[in-house]
């Protein structure tokens, strides 16, 4: 609790240990997935780098820890206590207490990239997802009332993906699906190949959590024209707009009215503009193109979607005015770079102390809406 508000962090991250492959991946696959070198600095699958960062990384740097942001001295100083114990579950809960976070929904770090490539063997992808999901369930078991996981599913094979989704949610208790907005195997998020997954997710009640991550080996907005700095600025909000178009304007949410979708780690300022633009095109019949949905895209967003904001996001009031607090959640991004300079006092405190927002709006963003989004019994 922070300043009298209960808090659910809708987008928090784990840092996977280097040995989870050895402990959780079946023996016949272990030689194909490698995390080697000083501090996890060389990572590959079937000899191919897991991410663009793995292609560029200077493996002579002992401080790298296998993640680009971890090379920052400021990051290492900010999270020194958790780093000393390799971000074990107890350290995450202790840091939640420092921030005033009551409940967290956990996303991957290495898993942002590990099975996201077009040429990945579907059987290996399924094994990696099962290994990660099992490890994450064990991680959350440290405090199952406060820690909740978001699963990986092998999207290279939609049938296997449905099977893993049901296992991860019904057997392991995970509350969402991590899903990048980028094209995978030539498919966008409105591809009919994914419809069985959406049907299963809607039936089970788990949320599709659209979450970008820079430095993927997949094609992403900005990767063909910007350096790492510009690419990170561009890819999150631009890819989320395209994902939102897929779901709201391309008929997916109309076809699956019980499906829930969250757009995370891209801020919320893009949403009012994008809904207005999609609605305008819909009202004018797509500038000569046939309408793809019966209702305006914003109708489906407000029926089935949520976005997230950082605690001090200046455009949150604009979102609330034009879209509504009912569609917004709080996300700290702990322990990634978005919360450096804010942890621990401001990652949540900048919102709980924001008197420009009503008490009701803050309560919705901090607790009521993320609880509904993830169907948390809290």
Q: Residue ranges of each PLM-predicted region?
A:
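Mid-to-C-terminal alpha-helical segments outside catalytic/metal-binding sites
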Residues: 2-8, 16-75, 79-103, 134-142, ...
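Alpha-helical scaffold segments that form or flank carboxylate-/histidine-based iron centers
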Residues: 5-12, 88, 153-156, 160
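Flexible loop residues that form catalytic
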Residues: 13, 109, 182, 213-214, ...
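Short aromatic-enriched loop/helix-cap "lid" or pocket-rim segments at secondary-structure transitions
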Residues: 19-22, 117-118, 220-223, 273-277, ...
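Divalent metal-dependent hydrolysis catalytic cores, especially in the metallo-beta-lactamase
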Residues: 75-84, 94-118, 146-154, 175-179
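Short glycine/proline- and charge-enriched loop/turn segments
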Residues: 119-121, 223-233, 344-350
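Active-site-proximal gating segment of KS-fold condensing enzymes and close homologs
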Residues: 123-139
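Catalytic pocket-lining loop regions of alpha/beta-barrel enzymes
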Residues: 127, 140-148, 153, 158-329
